[in-house]
Amino acid sequence: MRIDVESQNINVTSLKEAPIHLSGQIQPHGVLLVLEEPGLKILQVSNNTWGILGINAENILQKKLEDLLDSFQIERIQSGLSSGNLEFINPTKIWIRKKGDDYAVFDAVFHRNTEGFLILELEPAITQENIPFLSFYHLAKASINQLQKTANLRDFCQIIVQEVRKVTDFDRVMLYKFDDDGHGSVIAEEKLDSLEPYLGLHYPESDIPKPARKLFISNSIRVIPNAQAQAIQMIPALNPVSDRPVDLTNSILRSAANCHLEYLHNMGVGASLTISLIKDNKLWGLIACHHLSAKYVSYELRKACEFLGRVIFAEISAREETEDYDYRMNLTHIQSLLVEYMSQEDNFVDGLIKHQPSLLDLTSAQGAAVCFGDHCTLIGETPKAEDLVFLVQWLKNNVEEEVFYTDSLPQVYPDAERYKNVASGLLAIPISQRNYVLWFRPEVIQTVNWGGDPNQPFEVNKLDGNVRLCPRKSFELWKETVRLTSLPWRYVEIRAALELRKAIVNIVLRQADELAQLAHDLERSNAELKKFAYVASHDLQEPLNQVANYVQLLEMRYQDQLDADANEFITFAVEGVSLMQTLIDDVLAYSKVDTQAIAFQLTEVEKALDKALGNLRQRIAETGANITHDPLPTVMAGSTQLMQLFQNLIANAIKFRSEEAPQIHIGAERLEDEWLFSVRDNGIGIDPQFSDRIFVIFQRLHTRDEYHGTGMGLAICKKIIECHRGRIWVESQLGEGATFYFTIPVGGRERERRNGRKTQNNLFS
C-alpha cells in the first residue's frame, strides 16, 4: 500500500539523519568483537560466531581473547597494540581452532572507537584475490601512466573508472561528484554493455544524505558483498560497560542502513564497493562499483583500491588545480591592477569601475555594485539602486560570513525573482556591517537529467499498520527544466573576491587615517584662521572708524573751499570706508558662526522668518516683493542663526530680482530624518556652472557697479547650515529664477552640534 509522505506528516529529515553507526548490526561475512583493554575482555560479539568460528557466541562473552588464540598470537597482538599506531598490525593473520586440528585463517583488523573500546573484526582470509605488493605497485603505476596521457579532467575521470573496473572486475564503475548543494552527478562510467547508462545523470542529496557522507569520510572504502544478506545483531545489544550501543563508525563490517540496502535492491545491485575521494576533509566524490550479483572483495584488494583511490585523487586534485591555474593567474593579475587603481584614486570606488579591467572582470560577472552608506555605484547589468537597498539590508540581517555566494538568489531571497534576468546569481563581500561589494549573474535556464524524480526521493509503505520510509524504485531518466539559477561561482572567483575584500579594507583604513589627519590639520588651521579673522575684524574697526570720521570732518569743513575734483575724491573715500566697514562686519559675522556657541533649542521656524522679514521690511516695501510660505515646523536650531539664514536668502532674492516684482515662496517638507526647506524666487537666475562657486567666501558673479555686496552672504548661509549638520544647494537656470534648498535634521544631537563636532566616521559601523 502506497501513501503520500506529506499526508502522513513524516519527518523525512530526521529519518535521513538516523544514527547508522549505532545500529548494532554488521554484515554476515565476518565476525566483530568488542574488547575492553588492557585485558582484552570480550564485552560484545556478533551473533554469527557459530557459522564462522564454530563457537557459540554465549561461550565467548566475558572471556578474554587469549581464550581463543594461542600465546604467540596474543603476544604479537599486544606488541602491536602498544605501538600506538594500529596500522602497523592491520591486517594481521589470525588462526582460530574450530574442531580438533582444524584451524581457520582470518584477516584481523583492529581499531579503537570513540568510546575507547577496542574493536576486532575478523574476515575469512581468501587468497585467490591476494595481490602481492609488487603486483599492486605495477598495477598502480600502469594506471597512473594511462591517466597522465589524458588531456583534460573529463577524459582523466573516464580512465579512472576503466582502470578501477579492470582491478575489481565489477559490472559497473562510476565516478560520482558532489555539488555544493549536496546533489551529485555521474561524471564518468565504465560498465557492461547490457546495462543502462547512468553517465550524466544527477541524483538528489537525499540519495546520500549528510550522515552517510560523514561515514564515507571516516571509512574511505566500503564494501557490501551481498546486498540481500541478512544483517547480524550484536549481543548483547548494549555494551555492558557503557550501557549504550557500540559505536561502529569506523567498522569495515558495519551493516549499511536498511534504506540504503533497499535502494541498491531497487537499482538491481547485488554487491557494491565504494572508494571515497576526499579533499580538504570534505567528500569531493565517490568511485562507486556495482555488481549484479553477490561479490566478495578481499581485504588486500580493498586496500589496493583504497591506495589507488588516494593516488588517483591526488592526480585529480592536481588536474583541477592545473586547469584552474591559468584562470587563477589571470584573476590575480586583475586583482593587482584593481588594487593599483584604487590606491591611485581619491575615491577607491573609482578605481574599481573607471578602468579596464574593472570589477566585473574579477569574477566574470555581468553586473556589479559598490554600496557604501546610502549610495550604490553600479556597473554593468544590475538590479535598480532602490532594489539594492533592500538586498543589502537582507544581507546585513542574514549573512555573517566574509563571503556570500549563491547561483539561485531567488530561492533564498524571493524578492530577487523580480530581477532574475540580471541577478539570479549573487556573490557578495561585506566591507563593513553596512557596506558591500556585489557581483551579479543573470538567469541561465538549464535542463538537468535526473536518475528518477528528485522531488520524490522517498516512498512510504504501510504494512501491518506500520508506516515505513523506503527509497524510490524508479531510476528512469527524468528531465527537469531549472529556472531562477545562474552559472555557478567558481572557487577561484570566490577566493579572488575575498582577496579583494582584504585589499579594500586595507585601502579604506589607510584613507580613513589620512582623512582623519587632514581633518585634524584642517580643524586646527580653521580655528587659527577664524581666530585671526575675529581679532583682525575687531582691531580694524577702531582705525577704520577714525578714517571715516576724519574724512567726514574734512568734507564738512572744507567742502566750499575745494573744487569739484577734490569733492569727488572725498566722496570716493567715504564710499570706500563704508564698503570696508560692511566687509569687516560680514567677516566678523562669518567668523562668529563658528566661534560663538550656537544655542540649540526648539525653534519655531515661522518666528525666525518673521524676524528676518521685519529686518527687511524697507526693501520689501521699496521693491513690492510678495513673500509667501508653507506651514513651517518647529526644529532644533539656533534661532538667531536661522533668522540670519532666511534674511540672507530673501535679501538675495530681492537684490537679484528681474524686471517684475519679486515673488518669493518659502517651502518646507518632512523627509525621513530631516526637514527640507526651499526659498524660491522669480529673479534673474544663476548659470548652473556657478552653483557651487556662489557659496565660497568673497565669490561674486557680478561687479559692485551692477549689484552691491561683499560676496559673504551665501558663505555665511553655508556655515550656518553646516553647523546644523545640514546641506545647502541651489537649483537654477539663467533668467528663470532660483530655488535655494537647505536641510535641518529632525530632532537633534544638541551637544554634538553645540560643540561643532562631526559624528564618528561610520565607514566601519
Swiss-Prot record:
InterPro entries given in the database record: GAF, GAF-like_dom_sf, HATPase_C_sf, His_kinase_dom, HisK_dim/P_dom, HisK_dim/P_sf, PAS-like_dom_sf, PAS_2
Gene3D superfamilies assigned? 1.10.287.130, 3.30.450.270, 3.30.450.40, Histidine kinase-like ATPase, C-terminal domain (3.30.565.10), PAS domain (3.30.450.20)
One of the record's GO molecular function terms: ATP binding
**Keyword Transcription regulation belongs to the record:** yes
Q: Provide the reaction this enzyme catalyses.
A: ATP + protein L-histidine = ADP + protein N-phospho-L-histidine
Binding-site list for a tetrapyrrole:
259
Is Kinase found in the keyword set? Answer: yes
Task: Describe PTMs of this protein.
Answer: Contains one covalently linked tetrapyrrole chromophore.
Keywords attached to this Swiss-Prot or TrEMBL record, sorted alphabetically, are:
ATP-binding, Chromophore, Kinase, Nucleotide-binding, Phosphoprotein, Photoreceptor protein, Receptor, Sensory transduction, Transcription, Transcription regulation, Transferase
Question: What EC identifiers does the entry list?
Answer: 2.7.13.3
Which region ranges are annotated with the description Chromophore binding domain? Answer: 20-510
A biological-process GO annotation: detection of visible light
Per the record, the similarity remark reads: In the N-terminal section; belongs to the phytochrome family.
Return the protein name: Cyanobacterial phytochrome A
* Recorded name of the encoding gene: aphA
